[in-house]
Amino acid sequence: MLAKTLLALFAATAVAANPVAHDDRAVSIEDRADIEGRALCAGNLIDGPRKLSIGGTLRVYYSSAGGGTNCAYVTNDLGKEVFMYISLQDTSSSAFRLDDDYGDFSQFAGAVKLDGMAKHCFQVLVGIDGKTWMSRKDWHCGGGKVA
């Protein structure tokens, strides 16, 4: 009987501590988008969550894999489906390199990724519902953070 009581107590504690694993209704739209987005971006979070004035939250990751991989996505903080755009552009290369994602999204746009970025800088452009935000061109050079 004691073992059964302890097991029930442990299960109730685990559910309360981790509602995502047991009850999808307990997860906010932004948290759900963040969980899904993180599954797409490997590596370490090097910037973010950065709240953008245009209604989104940007996250940027860096991994040493693939000669240095940068990955980014932006969550939709507006609570409705809107046109979203995100691009990641290598600004250190003479060859134009860009990855982008766009469409009508209710949760997030991205993930966008560029490999071979270990000694390169990049720029991020985000568009949400007709408004835009752009980083500096010399942002996150070589996987490090530039404020």
Language-model features: locations:
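Fungal secretory targeting signals
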Residues: 1-25
